Amino acid sequence: MNAATLSGSELEVYVCPACKSHLMQEDGALRCPTCSKAYPMRQGIPDFVLEELSRSADPELRRMRFIDQMARIYETKLWYPVILKVFGGFSSRSFAQLISMVVGKVEAVKGRVLDIACGPGTFGRRIASPSKQVFGIDVSMGMLRQGAAYTAKEGITGMHFARARVEALPFADGFFDATLCCGSLHLFTDTLTALREMARVMKPGAVLAVFTFTAGRGGVLRYRQVRARMRRDHGLHVFELPEIEQYLTDSGFEHFQPDVSGSILTFNARKQPAGKFPF
């Protein structure tokens, strides 16, 4: 993928997030022949968001200005290791253990993997290969550019990045064999819409692997006052286990298998078989 274009095989992957039509490539952009929307390519990364962070009325997008700035430290000891111990507790899993556990849930999957709110591909880069294509989406262009730089430096093939929102994914129905959603489900404004959109683009029986937070027994998130303040000030929603299981059921997933370490929640579930849910 160069700065201006996608390869033919990559172009076939994406659809218009507005009308789900296949796209054409011209003049450095992806264009929809059905609804006429155009999505620019930015340093080789297709942008399906089309909104400047500084001008957005959406609090989730405004937060991305901060996320853009921390892209370079995101995978250092200054970020996740600290977050996991403060939020999850000192007895919770290490960052390396967490990555290994989550990617292990989809490691045996053959085919295409969607990496939701992928950041710089922290989880997806570990499993991307010529035989396992990983498509990461995030609203932070800073994170995506950092991920593209890491991917090139590490010589990884099979990792792709696009700027898109989880509520309007630029992929066709039933396209993916598995989905990762790591460190982000608790930040989505509408959890049900996000999960239903993930289910839409997954094949029946496909695996969903998630890392998020719960009101557990470790870290500051075990305190109700802290959870309330994090929700109010930062939009961080800490899930109860019955709550997240209900969200999954209402989104077309089954076989919820949670694992709690301190206040860190990892789980996997499967999209219901065809015919059991509307999508």
Language model segments and positions:
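N-terminal auxiliary segments of SAM/dcSAM-dependent transferases
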Residues: N2-R65
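Conserved class I S-adenosyl-L-methionine
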Residues: Q43, V49-A108, T122, R126, V207-R232, ...
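Class I SAM-dependent methyltransferase SAM/SAH-binding core
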Residues: R112-A168
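A short acidic, Gly/Pro-enriched loop at the edge of an enzyme's catalytic core
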Residues: E167-A178
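A short SAM/SAH-binding and catalytic strip from SAM-dependent methyltransferases
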Residues: A178-D190
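A short glycine-rich, Lys/Arg-flanked "PGG" loop and its adjoining helix->strand segment in the class I
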Residues: L192-P204
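Short alpha-helix
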Residues: L236-G252
